[in-house]
Amino acid sequence: MANRRMFSLDVVDTDRFLEMPLTAQCLYFHLGMRADDDGFIDSPKRILRYIGSNDDDLRILLTKGYLIPFEDGVIVIKDWL
């Protein structure tokens, strides 16, 4: 896993993103920092616990389309590149 990550202002500097609770925004950044080089996170619940977030924040990111879930619990960040 790389040690440097970049986040696009086209994603995080929008009303749609900024209207989310700060806890959901924080989760998005932490997931991005821990994603593999293709944007996949194999243990999102571990990261939730690690930063003191909750399932509602994850649900918000999924509902708004920032994350794509897989049946095995893995998620991918949609706007990864």
Language model features: what each stretch is:
Residues 2-81:
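Detector for short helical micro-motifs
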